[in-house]
């Protein structure tokens, strides 16, 4: 899965560009969001772009919801408060009813998520007639989001920081593998509905994570996306070459492959040196939080 085109490192692209102009870059490409500081202030800006054509072809409206939610989640994962988005809507020939249907439903999903998350669209553009030999591209709405950090020194990155930290998963895991990378790459199937986004849980979980980051209670944070829990943890280990040992919960209704590679939404992997107060806070707010394991070990 780590070698698939959707998940593999894109470093060969971004390393060719100067992403350290004026040395304001606090978090370089490869993480959940890029973070840059604002001169003369303590503020920072976080930026993220996201798209999921495979979700949008399976369910255009739910795909529209998901890409907005993931952009919101990526900004949250570095400690930023999401402010607004711009959209770039790429589709095939709108004279075909099915293509226009995809377009309309994606917009409905984007509107639904933006309204619930208070994440307004401030600009955007539309590109139609993207096709070759009468075959259109997958519905490809792209969302670019921006967020603000009141104090850039409190931003957080996704990589494990040191051995001995407790790894936790925040959010509800149901083992949804429909339209997942696992299904495509391992089972060689492209089918099933994409995971449904619970926007109430999305907002609650994200607001909680942001408060943990603001309070300095966690050492790393990464949203769970393509490839599920296993890929998310693997990416966190690769950042600083610090390993991890994890134990899956004993849930008879969720197969191990679905627990590891399912792409349920509204989830994060976080690490901390002191899990007890975080577990207590999560319990008080009825936010699902499970201790997954510990960092440590050579890569």
Predicted regions located by residue number:
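A short glycine-/small-residue-rich loop at the edge of a beta-strand within enzyme catalytic domains
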Residues: 59-62, 101, 193-203, 219-220, ...
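Glycine-rich phosphate/pyrophosphate-binding loop regions near the starts of catalytic domains
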Residues: 2-175, 180-191
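Phosphate-interacting basic helix/loop segments used at nucleotide- and nucleic-acid interfaces
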Residues: 209
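Glycine-/charge-enriched secondary-structure boundary and capping motifs
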Residues: 1, 106-109, 113, 117, ...
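In a subset of proteins, long, contiguous C-terminal domains/tails are tracked
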Residues: 152, 163, 180, 202-204, ...
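A general structural motif
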Residues: 26-28, 63-66, 147-150, 196-206, ...
């Amino acid at each position: 899965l780590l070698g698939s085109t959707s998940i593999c490192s894109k470093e060969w692209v971004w390393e060719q560009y100067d992403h350290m102009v004026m040395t304001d870059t606090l978090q370089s490409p490869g993480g959940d969001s890029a973070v840059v500081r604002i001169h003369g202030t303590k503020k920072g800006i976080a930026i993220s772009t996201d798209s999921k054509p495979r979700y949008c072809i399976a369910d255009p409206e739910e795909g529209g919801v998901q890409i907005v939610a993931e952009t919101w989640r990526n900004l949250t994962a570095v400690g930023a408060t999401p402010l607004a988005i711009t959209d770039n809507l790429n589709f095939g020939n709108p004279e075909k009813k099915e293509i226009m249907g995809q377009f309309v439903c994606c917009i409905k999903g984007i509107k639904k998520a933006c309204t619930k998350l208070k994440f307004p669209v401030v600009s955007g553009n539309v590109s139609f007639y993207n096709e070759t030999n009468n075959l259109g591209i997958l519905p490809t709405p792209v969302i670019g989001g921006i967020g603000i950090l009141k104090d850039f020194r409190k931003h957080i990155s996704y990589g494990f920081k040191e051995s001995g930290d407790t790894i936790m998963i925040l959010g509800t895991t149901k083992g949804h593998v429909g339209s997942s990378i696992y299904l495509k790459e391992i089972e060689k199937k492209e089918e099933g509905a994409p995971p449904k986004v619970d926007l109430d849980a999305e907002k609650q979980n994200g607001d909680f994570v942001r408060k943990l980051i603001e309070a300095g209670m966690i050492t790393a944070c990464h949203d769970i996306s393509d490839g599920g829990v296993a890929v998310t943890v693997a990416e966190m280990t690769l950042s600083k070459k610090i390993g991890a040992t994890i134990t899956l919960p004993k849930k008879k209704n969720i197969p191990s492959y679905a627990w590891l590679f399912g792409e349920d939404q509204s989830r994060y992997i976080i690490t901390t040196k002191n899990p007890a107060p975080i577990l207590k806070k999560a319990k008080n707010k009825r936010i699902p939080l499970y201790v997954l394991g510990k960092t440590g070990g050579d890569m």
